[in-house]
Design a protein with these regions (language model features):
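Basic/aromatic-rich interaction segments and small domains that mediate binding to polyanionic partners
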Residues: 3-65, 70-71
């Protein structure tokens, strides 16, 4: 289940925002009890893709990025 501040990737290109498949972003808002999400994406130069903040992404469009903690 996806939740606030999860790191996700977009499964397919979004031509409306210019976000490409595989781009990592962070969930910044959960809508309708998890039926949709606002995701903040950045381009390869580190610039925020503003249009992504006005787009609702469904869980089917997103893939959670699993991270492993390494303790030293």
């Amino acid at each position: 289940m996806l939740k606030l501040f999860d790191t996700v990737t977009l499964k397919n290109d979004d031509p409306e925002t210019g976000v490409k498949a595989g781009t990592e972003g962070t969930i910044v808002d959960v809508l309708g009890n998890g039926k949709a999400f606002t995701v903040e994406y950045f381009d390869e130069d580190g610039n925020k893709i503003e249009a992504s903040l006005y787009t609702e992404y469904t869980p089917a469009q997103l893939q959670k990025v699993e991270t492993a903690l390494t303790l030293t």
